[in-house]
């Protein structure tokens, strides 16, 4: 790009589960402006979740225009657009009209559970894990796509005739931004569909046959950092902007944290927790209940990671606030937790919806252990925060065993990282330093970095690493005997919650 030195900004489109955002970054990776719009959630039946793809497009395209207008930025000052998105959510549309044939089926939606059960009965569970790196679960796109083709009248015939297209949200947005000229996805999003062979890096013929999905529906799969096409944008003067970066939200956060080498890991502390550890160019098969997924290498090329999800993180603090009403605000939890020197032997296991990685026990249920008359609300609040750190260690221990890599440091992002007590206890229970960055918008930043590298806005990974400023490092302050004693108590508590809901209570 001949005029790249005249460009001042990169825009990240961050399409999430509840809102669409656009964030403008300057050359120093500072946020210049941002816009956000929420959209409707639809729950047609228990366990079903849908979005309107046209509303996603409307909110995302308007935030792009708003963010540029907010800072009086003209399109010719923007080097590129990067896209990061909620993963697995599935859209099917008519290639001629551009209209979706059904609402988007969201990653949380469980409607394809019966399809997954049939895949297991057919003995495909091991094949799916070996080939795609995933577990056989409705979470992923493949069975959602099959459900749409099976349940929308005429969809199967239209798909076989080449009239329908499939995409995750990144693909849908790029199709709309390029006015139907470009039908692509990146390797990180493709690896979440349960249709993609992460070793050959191509759509898997056997999975397509099993689920009866025509290959003609599927997008071209490209690297996470390259120019895919030009976005037509509205606003003053209109214009075109190159779309030059794509990554699923968790992989984008991993790249935004500059975790691009084996053993580097990040944890996003949100409602739940998402942990990813980079494993370099090696797809590590997990024997400890983790997913093997594609991540971004140093220049946006294919790398691999292990991924584990904790179901209840920040949601556990919300439970203290909303149901038990022992705090008025989530931020208060740090104050009360530090009023006592320890949890007084109390362990809270927040298995409200079962346990995620590495246990994968849907029948576990939440419990509090170690209650005595000496236990106060402050102890329970402290035990609740500690449970987030313990669950994180569960996943990281599994990652280190699978990868044969020692965790160098844990990089953190998400809302709960503002809690200094939690971050310090996390370092203590891991025996590893925890690094909290100045820039908290790591997901959007990752998408911006990928786009900026592709178009020459940033020249190298070293340049990006120089911008990754750590606001605070939490060093372990707990000696090993105490650390292991505390963690042994947690493991004992978790074991007592396993298999609790046997259907007889």
Swiss-Prot record:
EC number(s) from the headed UniProt entry: 2.7.1.30
Residues involved in ATP binding: 17-19, 271, 314, 318, 415
Binding site for glycerol: 87-88, 139, 249-250
A Gene Ontology biological process term: glycerol metabolic process
GO cellular component terms attached to this protein's record: cytosol
Mechanisms controlling activity: Inhibited by fructose 1,6-bisphosphate (FBP).
Keywords recorded for this protein, A-Z: ATP-binding, Glycerol metabolism, Kinase, Nucleotide-binding, Transferase
Alphabetized InterPro entries for the sequence: ATPase_NBD (IPR043129), Carb_kinase_FGGY (IPR000577), Carb_kinase_FGGY_CS (IPR018483), FGGY_C (IPR018485), FGGY_N (IPR018484), Glycerol_kin (IPR005999)
Keyword Transport in record: no
CDD domains reported in the protein's UniProt record: FGGY_EcGK_like (cd07786)
Catalysed transformations (reactions): glycerol + ATP = sn-glycerol 3-phosphate + ADP + H(+)
GO MF terms held by the record: ATP binding; glycerol kinase activity
Binding site for sn-glycerol 3-phosphate: 17, 87-88, 139, 249
A family per Pfam: FGGY_N
Function: Key enzyme in the regulation of glycerol uptake and metabolism. Catalyzes the phosphorylation of glycerol to yield sn-glycerol 3-phosphate.
Name of this protein: Glycerol kinase 2
Organism annotation: Pseudomonas aeruginosa (strain ATCC 15692 / DSM 22644 / CIP 104116 / JCM 14847 / LMG 12228 / 1C / PRS 101 / PAO1)
Protein's gene: glpK2
């Amino acid at each position: 790009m001949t005029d790249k030195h005249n460009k001042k900004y990169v825009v990240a489109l961050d399409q999430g589960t509840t809102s669409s955002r656009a964030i403008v970054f300057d050359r120093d990776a500072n946020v210049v402006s941002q816009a956000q719009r929420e959209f409707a959630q639809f729950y047609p039946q228990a366990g079903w979740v849908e979005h309107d793809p046209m509303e996603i497009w409307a909110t995302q395209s308007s935030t792009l225009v708003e963010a540029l207008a907010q800072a009086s930025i003209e399109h010719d000052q923007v080097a590129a657009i990067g896209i990061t998105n909620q993963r697995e959510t599935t859209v099917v549309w008519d290639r001629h009209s551009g209209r979706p044939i059904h609402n988007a089926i969201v990653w949380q939606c469980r409607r394809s559970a019966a399809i997954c059960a049939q895949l297991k009965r057919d003995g495909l569970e091991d094949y799916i894990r070996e080939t795609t790196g995933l577990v056989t679960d409705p979470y992923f796109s493949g069975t959602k796509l099959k459900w749409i083709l099976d349940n929308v009248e005429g969809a199967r015939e239209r798909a076989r005739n080449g009239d329908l297209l499939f995409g995750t949200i990144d693909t849908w947005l790029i199709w709309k931004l390029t006015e139907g000229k470009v039908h692509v996805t990146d390797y990180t999003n493709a690896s979440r569909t349960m249709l993609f062979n992460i070793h050959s890096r191509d759509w898997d013929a056997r999975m397509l046959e099993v689920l009866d999905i025509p290959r003609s529906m599927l997008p071209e799969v490209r690297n996470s950092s390259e120019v895919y096409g030009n976005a037509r944008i509205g606003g003053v003067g209109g214009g075109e902007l190159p779309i030059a970066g794509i990554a699923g939200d968790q992989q984008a956060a991993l790249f935004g944290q500059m975790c691009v080498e084996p053993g580097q890991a990040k944890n996003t502390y949100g409602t739940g927790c998402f942990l990813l550890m980079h494993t370099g160019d090696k797809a590590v098969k997990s024997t400890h209940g983790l997913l093997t997924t594609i991540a971004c290498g140093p220049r946006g090329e294919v790398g691999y990671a292990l991924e584990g999800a904790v179901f209840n993180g920040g949601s556990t603090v919300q439970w203290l606030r909303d149901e038990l009403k022992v705090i008025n605000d989530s931020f208060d939890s740090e104050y009360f937790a530090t009023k006592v020197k320890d949890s007084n032997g109390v362990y809270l296991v927040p298995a409200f919806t079962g346990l995620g990685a590495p246990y994968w026990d849907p029948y576990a249920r939440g419990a509090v252990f170690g209650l005595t008359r000496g236990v106060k609300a402050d102890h329970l609040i402290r035990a609740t925060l500690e449970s987030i750190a313990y669950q994180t260690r569960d996943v990281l221990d599994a990652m280190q065993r699978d990868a044969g890599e020692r965790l160098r440091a844990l990089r953190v992002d998400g809302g709960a990282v503002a809690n200094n007590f939690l971050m310090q206890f996390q370092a203590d229970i891991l025996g590893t330093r925890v690094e909290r960055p100045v820039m908290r918008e790591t997901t959007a930043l990752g998408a911006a970095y990928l786009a900026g590298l592709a178009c020459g806005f940033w020249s190298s990974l070293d340049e990006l690493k120089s911008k990754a400023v750590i606001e605070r490092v939490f060093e372990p302050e707990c000696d090993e005997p105490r650390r292991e004693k505390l963690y042994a108590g947690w493991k004992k508590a978790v074991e007592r919650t396993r298999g609790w809901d046997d259907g007889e209570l």
